[in-house]
C-alpha cells in the first residue's frame, strides 16, 4: 500500500524535506536539488500552493513560524515558484525586513548613502508592488540622502494614511498577500493560460535569507551561464557586480558597474580577482548540468569572500541553441538520445535550417518611411 505524503503550508528546504514541484513549484524543488548537491544555498522556506491561495483571501500562515529559521532581524527576498517557470509569476520583492533600525545599523557598515539607497529601493518596491501606489510618486533621486528618505516616507504616509511598516512580520505578511492576489488576478491568469497553464494553476513562494555586502571581505552579486544563449556553444557568459551595487539592481549582462567573469582585455574579471571563487562557480555549474540534466543560469553572491548560490533556472535560449544543447547533453551521456530528440521544438528546426540575423546585433537604419 502506497503511503501518502502530507505537505504543510511552510517547509524549510532541506535535503530530506517533503517537496514537490506540483505542490511547491519548480523553483522550490530546484533549490532543494541544489541543497542535495551540497551547494551553499541560503536558508530558504517554501510556501505551498494551498498556503499561497489561502493568503490571497486573507488567511496568512503563521508569521512567527515562517520567520523562525532566519533568526533575529533578517532581511529576506520573496520570489515566485510556479509549477512551470514559463508560466511566470509576480515580481520578486527584496530586502523585506528593512526598517529604521536596520538602516541605522547598515550605515555603520557601508555608509549613509549606500544604506539609504537600499532602504529607498525597498520602500519604492513595497509602495508600488505591495501597496499598489503610483510609481511616479516614488522616484529615487540620483543622490540618496536622509532628506530623500524622509520625503519618500512622507509620501507613503500621505497616500496610505499610515506610516511605513517597521515590523518585519507585517511587511512579510503584506508581501505574501500582494503576490498571492497578483497571481489570482484576471490579467495574470490569461497570460499564463496563453502559455499553456491550466486556469487553476497554483503558485508557490520561496522566502530566502538575503546575503548582504556588510563583511570586511569581498561582497557582491552575479549571474553566470556556461553556454551561449544564441548559438548553444560552450561559453561562460555573465557579469558580477561588486559590493553594494549588487543589492541595488537586478544583475544582467549590460549592468552598469559590472565586471567580467572570465579574463577579458577590456577590464577586470572575477577570474583575475577571485580565482578560487571563480573555480568554485565553474565546478558548481558542471554539477548543475549533470545532476539537473540541463543548461542552467546560476545566480550567486559573494558574502565576505564566501560563495553562495541563490538560484538556478533553466537557461533561456534560441531555437538554434536548443538543438545544440540537446545534442551536447546526449553526447555527454547526461540525457538519452531519445530524450534529446523530444526536447527539440519543431519550430527550432525551421530556425536552424534558415539563415538568421543575430538578435543581439546592432542594426543601422538606412531608410525610413510610411505607407498607406
Regions found by a protein language model. Give the residues of each.
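Nucleotide/phosphate-binding sheet-loop regions of phosphoryl- and nucleotidyl-transfer enzymes
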Residues: 1-370
Amino acid at each position: 500500500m502506497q503511503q501518502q505524503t502530507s505537505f504543510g503550508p511552510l517547509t524549510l528546504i532541506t535535503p530530506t524535506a517533503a517537496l514537490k514541484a506540483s505542490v511547491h513549484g519548480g523553483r522550490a524543488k530546484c533549490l532543494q536539488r541544489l541543497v542535495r548537491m551540497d551547494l551553499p544555498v541560503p536558508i530558504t522556506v517554501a510556501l505551498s500552493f494551498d498556503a499561497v491561495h489561502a493568503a490571497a483571501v486573507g488567511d496568512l500562515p503563521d508569521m512567527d513560524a515562517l520567520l523562525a529559521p532566519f533568526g533575529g532581524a533578517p532581511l529576506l527576498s520573496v520570489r515566485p515558484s510556479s509549477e512551470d517557470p514559463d508560466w511566470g509569476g509576480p515580481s520578486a520583492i527584496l530586502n523585506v525586513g528593512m526598517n529604521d533600525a536596520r538602516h541605522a545599523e547598515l550605515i555603520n557598515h557601508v555608509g549613509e548613502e549606500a544604506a539609504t539607497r537600499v532602504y529607498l529601493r525597498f520602500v519604492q518596491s513595497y509602495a508600488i508592488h505591495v501597496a499598489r501606489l503610483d510609481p511616479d510618486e516614488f522616484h529615487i533621486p540620483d543622490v540618496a540622502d536622509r532628506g530623500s528618505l524622509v520625503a519618500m516616507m512622507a509620501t507613503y504616509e500621505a497616500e496610505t494614511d499610515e506610516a511605513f511598516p517597521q515590523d518585519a512580520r507585517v511587511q512579510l505578511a503584506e508581501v505574501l498577500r500582494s503576490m498571492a492576489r497578483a497571481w489570482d488576478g484576471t490579467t495574470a491568469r490569461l497570460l499564463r493560460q496563453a502559455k499553456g497553464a491550466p486556469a487553476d494553476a497554483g503558485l508557490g513562494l520561496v522566502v530566502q535569507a538575503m546575503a548582504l555586502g556588510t563583511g570586511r571581505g569581498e561582497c557582491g552579486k552575479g549571474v553566470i551561464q556556461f553556454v551561449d544563449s544564441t548559438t548553444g556553444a560552450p561559453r561562460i557568459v555573465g557579469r558580477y557586480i561588486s559590493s553594494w551595487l549588487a543589492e541595488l539592481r537586478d544583475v544582467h549582462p549590460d549592468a552598469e558597474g559590472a565586471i567580467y567573469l572570465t579574463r577579458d582585455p577590456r577590464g577586470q574579471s572575477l577570474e583575475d580577482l577571485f580565482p578560487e571563487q571563480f573555480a568554485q562557480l565553474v565546478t558548481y555549474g558542471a554539477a548543475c548540468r549533470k545532476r539537473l540534466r540541463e543548461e542552467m543560469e546560476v545566480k550567486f553572491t559573494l558574502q565576505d569572500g564566501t560563495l553562495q548560490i541563490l538560484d538556478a533556472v533553466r537557461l533561456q535560449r534560441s531555437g538554434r541553441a536548443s538543438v545544440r544543447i540537446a545534442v551536447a547533453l546526449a553526447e555527454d551521456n547526461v540525457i538519452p538520445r531519445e530524450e534529446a530528440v523530444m526536447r527539440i521544438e519543431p519550430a527550432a528546426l525551421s530556425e536552424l535550417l534558415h539563415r538568421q540575423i543575430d538578435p543581439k546585433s546592432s542594426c543601422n537604419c538606412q531608410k525610413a518611411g510610411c505607407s498607406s
